[in-house]
């Protein structure tokens, strides 16, 4: 599988070890940078990862910055990206299996490398489990990528709120 991998200057060392891990698992890594510790800006590399994924050059993407918050916000601005910032296996699997996430984000200063690699491996090997409900939710998320009149409608999510009120969602 082809995995796009990007980071900011704070976690270049972490990214390099993740790259080595992915290669050891037989994956092709598309390293979009950064490549050293010179101060840079995470949105550049979040965007590059997202573009590799939505163009089809990469199957999935991994973004890492200090907390993961900034680069994950940046990659989610690329139309077609569904990225989740995760720190645990449960969140990563939910993102892939239920929301068909195609990018995963991490805080390299928040989570240890070994756990990060385990989560990435599980994310890559997990499969999206399409249901009618998941498809509708993903369609609503996708609809938000383009500003349009429907989003201004205060009833945009009513269908899902009504199901909540009827007790159809369970944790």
Curated annotation (Swiss-Prot):
It holds the Pfam family LacAB_rpiB. GO terms for biological process: D-allose catabolic process; galactose catabolic process; lactose catabolic process via tagatose-6-phosphate; pentose-phosphate shunt, non-oxidative branch. InterPro entries: LacB, RpiB_LacA_LacB, RpiB_LacA_LacB_sf. It comes from the Bacteria. One of its GO terms (molecular function) is galactose-6-phosphate isomerase activity. Keywords: Isomerase, Lactose metabolism. Heteromultimeric protein consisting of LacA and LacB. NCBIfam families: lacB, PRK05571.1, PRK08622.1, PRK12615.1, rpiB_lacA_lacB. This is Galactose-6-phosphate isomerase subunit LacB. It comes from Staphylococcus aureus (strain bovine RF122 / ET3-1). The lineage of its organism: Bacteria, Bacillati, Bacillota, Bacilli, Bacillales.
């Amino acid at each position: 599988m082809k995995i796009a991998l990007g980071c900011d200057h704070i976690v270049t060392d972490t990214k390099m070890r993740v790259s080595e891990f992915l290669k050891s698992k037989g994956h092709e890594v598309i390293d979009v940078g950064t490549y050293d510790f010179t101060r840079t800006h995470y949105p550049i590399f979040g965007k590059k990862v997202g573009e590799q994924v939505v163009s089809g050059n990469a199957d999935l993407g991994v973004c890492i910055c200090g907390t993961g918050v900034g680069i994950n916000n940046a990659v989610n601005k690329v139309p077609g990206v569904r990225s989740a910032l995760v720190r645990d296996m449960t969140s990563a699997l939910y993102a892939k299996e239920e929301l068909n996430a195609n990018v995963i984000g991490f805080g390299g200063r928040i989570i240890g490398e070994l756990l990060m690699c385990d989560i990435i491996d599980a994310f890559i090997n997990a499969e999206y489990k399409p249901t009618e409900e998941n498809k509708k939710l993903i369609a609503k998320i996708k609809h938000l990528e383009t500003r349009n009149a429907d989003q201004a409608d205060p009833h945009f999510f009513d269908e899902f709120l009504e199901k909540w009120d009827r007790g159809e969602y369970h944790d």
